[in-house]
Amino acid sequence: MRYNPALDGLRAVAVMLVLAFHARLFGGFGGFFGVDVFFVLSGYLITRILAEQHAATGSLRIGAFYARRLRRLYPALLLLLAVYLAAAPWVFPEHANHLRDAAVAGLYLSDYGFALWRVPWYLQHTWSLSVEEHFYLVWPMVLMVVFRLPRHWWAPAVLLLAIAATIWRWHVALNDDAWYHPYYRFDTC
């Protein structure tokens, strides 16, 4: 896939929205929108990469795809967790579960950990990495099924999946006491 500098511009806007949200600028507006932009960009890029691979080879090399994703994202997460584990006992001495929280984040389970158990408390910002990693695990398998359909069924199949996902997200948002579940749980993103 060719490099597209416009996508870097969108990433920059998304970063600014997230930073503005956490700095409480603009009344806290824009943070979730910025994360949504990241998710859409990631979904677009991953779908395009996998679709181009399928068009070129007639198959998907999912193992190689997973290995690339892990090599790209995991080193930075491990560095963050190492720094956290080294500093957290002194910076957050009142919190006794640093190792548990790092394990939850390191296993890309922060989205469920926070939604279900309110952990990892000081690493809750890793929820978006968890959601993205879960997407990386599921989406290639969904595309494998879609690519086995006749080509004229591809768009309707993906549209049907999007509609079903939207209905499920609305259901959870309207019938769950926790407002944050639609953001933090993979099954609603």
Regions found by a protein language model. Name each.
Residues 3-4, 13-189:
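Hydrophobic membrane-embedded alpha-helices
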Residues 8:
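Mature N-terminal segment immediately following signal peptide/propeptide cleavage
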